[in-house]
Regions:
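Acidic, glycine-rich A-domain
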Residues: 1-62, 123, 134-139, 148, ...
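Negatively charged sequence features
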Residues: 43-125
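Internal, hydrophobic cores of structured domains that mediate oligomerization or house catalytic pockets
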Residues: 95-169
Length: 272
């Protein structure tokens, strides 16, 4: 866990893994602001969270959301089948080609011709932050729909050779004037050296309870949270605010407006 005070208003809290985030939630007592207040992480309805209880959300977090994982595998296969990796020509010696290598020909070496072979381009490592900043009026089904888009985009980029770090982020703000506070929570759910594990990612990336139970629990336990967050858990940070915090990285906003089928390169991630 790393914390950084960006300014008097904004504090960024980063977790290097889902396990580190979970351990913090489970082992940290309720903060002073929420100690005697209602805990939305517990009382949230099934229609709002898609789970019956906090315990059910934790179980899905630990064991995986198998129903959605099966659905996602099929969707991602379609995405992968329509995506071709970026290729570049590479010279190689061959028995036939466009130019003879005379010394090799004289020596009787069979591979005495210069030819070209198309090989995948090794792409750079990029970091993508998926915003889970949905307000209370956003339906749980809409959260699922938008979050699936994020997984499809990452799959397309990796099929082209990009290596993606993937984070989920929550930015929440409450208070006014000098008392205004903003907390930006960033959780690494996939490292660039990992292949996409749909079973592992289905719950934290797609399930509404990741926001409405587990991230709510973070607000309930993090010591610096003030009483202004009680009740509504703050209001979502704007995408422009998150982009400033994560300069040099890519942001997938809560609502992706572009057609996912038209997002093919990292250049297409601008203003999605």
């Amino acid at each position: 866990m790393k914390t950084e005070q960006i300014n008097s208003k904004t504090e960024v809290i980063q977790y290097d893994s889902l396990q580190e985030f979970y351990d913090y939630l489970i082992n940290t007592p309720f903060n002073q602001a929420f100690c005697w207040s209602e805990h939305g992480s517990v009382t949230g309805s099934k229609s709002f969270t898609k789970t019956e209880s906090f315990s059910e959300a934790v179980e899905l977090f630990k064991s995986g959301w198998s129903d959605m994982a099966s659905n996602l595998v099929q969707r991602l296969k379609v995405i992968e089948s329509k995506t071709e990796p970026t290729m570049k020509p590479r010279n190689k010696l061959d028995v036939c080609g466009y130019q003879a290598i005379v010394p090799l020909y004289i020596q009787g070496v069979p591979n005495n011709m210069m030819n070209k072979k198309m090989v995948p381009v090794k792409q750079k490592v990029i970091t993508i932050n998926k915003s889970l900043d949905y307000n209370g009026m956003t339906s749980s089904d809409k959260i699922i729909e938008e979050s699936i888009k994020a997984m499809q985009i990452v799959k397309k980029l990796e099929a082209q050779g990009f290596r993606c770090n993937l984070n989920i982020v929550l930015g929440t703000t409450a208070g006014y004037g000098k008392n205004e506070k903003q907390f930006v929570v960033k959780v690494r759910i996939k490292s660039a050296n990992e292949k996409m594990n749909v079973s592992k990612l289905a719950f934290p990336l797609v399930h509404p309870s990741m926001l409405r139970r587990l991230f709510f629990r973070f607000v309930e336990v993090y010591p610096n949270v003030t009483k202004d967050f009680v009740g509504g858990y703050g209001h979502p940070a704007h995408s422009s605010e998150l982009r400033k915090v994560f300069a040099g990285e890519y942001l997938l906003p809560n609502f992706v407006k572009k057609d996912v089928s038209k997002i093919n390169t990292i250049d297409d991630l601008e203003n999605v």
